[in-house]
């Protein structure tokens, strides 16, 4: 049995505050998208032996964060569904230009988009890519792709139980699937997962570095952390006990720290 992680890329950077229909339109990750990808690294990096991804920038950038020490293998058939005449347009513009189709899709999300690849075609394309990847690889692997092709693929495997929209997943989340001894994908718990890794020092630094803070901001952050830890050392020498690395990041100290202060206030 092998583990297969189907991951949706981190949140992309849109041109403005509007929401966009971005099938194969190539947007890079936003600041939040980079942070989401580093959290995926914290959760999955030591669990996988290879990572495959869509050729779109938002997927490749996510894959690079997840396994910085492993090359990510780009597979064209893992790309997002082509959304035809709507691809790359804001939903406000789509609503104005195709009001009837927009309304129809509000009732039926699979109502055809002009010129778009069908969900079935994109699901079959993605399914064939998964088959080839499993056939030519070993160990536990991650696939970094997109919500539409992932949901279309899972719907093909489980259409008797759920509608296709059931399988859509938020940016920076993933499905954890397994294979049988013949490398056939086995569906069990089909609940998407959000990463919740332990926030150790190295991961916190990776989160900070992923958003490319200006040097002076980064230096200020380091100086504040150093000073906060110095204050914590001073307090600990007078009987206060708490986790200085975590409490220095909180606006309000932990309850354990407050309790310690009350019980040791006479030791000053």
Where are these regions (language model features)?
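Acidic, low-complexity terminal tails and accessory targeting/binding regions
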Residues: 1-2, 75, 81-93, 155-211
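Divalent metal-dependent catalytic cores for phosphoryl transfer on phosphate-bearing substrates
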Residues: 237-268
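Active-site flanking loop/helix segments enriched in acidic
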Residues: 199-223, 256-267
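Short glycine/proline- and acidic residue-enriched helix-loop micro-motifs
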Residues: 101-121, 207-212
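Active-site-adjacent alpha-helix immediately C-terminal to a catalytic or transition-state-stabilizing loop
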Residues: 60, 68, 127-184
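Loop-to-helix element that buttresses phosphate recognition and phosphoryl-transfer chemistry
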Residues: 8-61, 113-126
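Short glycine-rich phosphate-binding loop at a beta-alpha junction
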Residues: 48-55, 140-144, 245
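Phosphate-coordination/substrate-recognition cap region in phosphate-metabolizing enzymes
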Residues: 38-102
């Amino acid at each position: 049995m092998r583990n297969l992680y189907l991951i949706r890329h981190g949140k992309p950077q849109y041109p403005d505050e509007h929401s966009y229909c971005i099938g194969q339109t190539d947007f890079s990750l936003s600041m939040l998208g980079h942070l989401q990808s580093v959290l995926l690294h914290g959760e999955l990096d030591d669990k996988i032996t290879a990572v495959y991804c869509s050729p779109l920038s938002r997927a490749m950038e996510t894959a690079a964060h997840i396994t910085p020490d492993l090359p990510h293998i780009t597979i064209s058939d893992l790309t997002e569904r082509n959304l035809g005449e709507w691809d790359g347009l804001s939903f406000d513009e789509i609503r104005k230009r195709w009001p009837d189709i927009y309304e129809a899709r509000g009732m039926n999300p699979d109502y055809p988009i002009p010129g778009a690849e069908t969900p079935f075609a994109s699901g079959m394309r993605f399914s064939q890519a998964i088959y080839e990847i499993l056939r030519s690889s070993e160990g536990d692997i991650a696939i970094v792709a997109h919500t539409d092709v992932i949901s279309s693929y899972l719907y093909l495997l489980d259409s008797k139980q759920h509608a296709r929209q059931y399988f859509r997943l938020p940016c920076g989340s993933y499905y954890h699937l397994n294979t049988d001894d013949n490398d056939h994908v086995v569906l069990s718990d089909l609940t998407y997962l959000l990463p919740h890794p332990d926030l150790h020092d190295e991961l916190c630094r990776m989160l900070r570095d992923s958003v490319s803070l200006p040097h002076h901001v980064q230096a200020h952050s380091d100086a504040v952390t150093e000073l906060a830890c110095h204050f914590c050392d001073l307090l600990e020498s007078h009987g206060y006990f708490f986790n200085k690395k975590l409490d220095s990041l909180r606006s309000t100290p932990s309850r354990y720290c407050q309790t310690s202060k009350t019980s040791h206030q006479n030791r000053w």
